[in-house]
């Protein structure tokens, strides 16, 4: 982001939640050996997301965005930027993104020879591999909050010093576990299920259970730019 690494030190993954989407000016892709200028994790290529700069002329601007999508997906954002004088400018921003999610995971099981104790109301759906679809964890509900601020001091037309702070909070959980197995109209999540031909599947209730997650991240950057002495 603006030439600075966004990968985590834990697993080298990308902190996408920290990217202030409404502030993106352009995206650059650096391929080949030149990407090594960005550090040891940048071998092969670099994707550099460039954000919009603060206004050049004295004054202030405010940008608000509200959008809605499928699965009750919302995005709300508010950004304000201002230039105090010829040398000093700053910006603040807030983004909230959340969704009720969708059923993106399903649990399958292979049949084995045995006598089942549960005779389902109807045949279970089956994949071409022969495995049976037994259900899933349900929808993955998530919410991200992103707060950002920056202050920039221009020494002259070529040299500037900029401090940027980004704070992100992310939460997710699974809800409404579902099953394809019903007995007398009631959902079945465990047991020995008769699928016919002397075969059974044995779903386990633990497989249907999702998990909760929460993550907080802070990013502080101090960058000095000297256009006059670039090489």
Language model: regions and residue ranges:
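Short acidic/polar hinge/loop motifs at secondary-structure boundaries
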Residues: 4-31
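Outer-membrane beta-barrel domain signature
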Residues: 14, 38, 65-68, 134-139, ...
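N-terminal periplasmic accessory domains that precede
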Residues: 14-20, 41-65, 74-79
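Membrane-embedded beta-strand positions in outer-membrane beta-barrel channels/transporters
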Residues: 26, 31, 46, 61-63, ...
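Transmembrane beta-barrel wall of Gram-negative outer-membrane proteins
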Residues: 68, 72-99, 107-175, 214-219, ...
